[in-house]
């Protein structure tokens, strides 16, 4: 018996759509990351990108627990002296709700070019509409 090693020809990617209404941010992000990496497939290989495409709609209605809306802060730096910018989760949800989920999933993916390729398969939209109807995405049930 030989050990099976997947090749790029063996990869079968599917499209899924997730409605993020009233789902908790971190719990949703872990389920999405699991699918993006392909860890739910029996032919998973850590050195290959064999995950599925995920379309997330209604990201503006996502929930968080505790006082994270006011307390959680996101930081970015322009590269200049004194160029540190911070924004709270509440303000980021009001202005760019899709970035909240993208940041959460990005933190759970590998920090290399494979992780960047996996993140490109995540499509996040604030409202209920998405332009990926031609791919016929199947609804994905989130466990919790």
UniProtKB/Swiss-Prot annotation:
PROSITE patterns: RIBOSOMAL_L13. The gene is rplM. The keyword Ribosomal protein applies. One of its GO terms (cellular component) is cytosolic large ribosomal subunit. One of its GO terms (biological process) is translation. It comes from the Bacteria. It comes from Nitratidesulfovibrio vulgaris (strain DSM 19637 / Miyazaki F). Belongs to the universal ribosomal protein uL13 family. SUPFAM superfamilies: Ribosomal protein L13. PANTHER family: LARGE RIBOSOMAL SUBUNIT PROTEIN UL13M, RIBOSOMAL PROTEIN L13. HAMAP family: Ribosomal_uL13. It holds the Pfam family Ribosomal_L13. Keywords: Ribonucleoprotein, Ribosomal protein. This is Large ribosomal subunit protein uL13. GO terms for molecular function: mRNA binding; structural constituent of ribosome. Part of the 50S ribosomal subunit. This protein is one of the early assembly proteins of the 50S ribosomal subunit, although it is not seen to bind rRNA by itself. It is important during the early stages of 50S assembly.
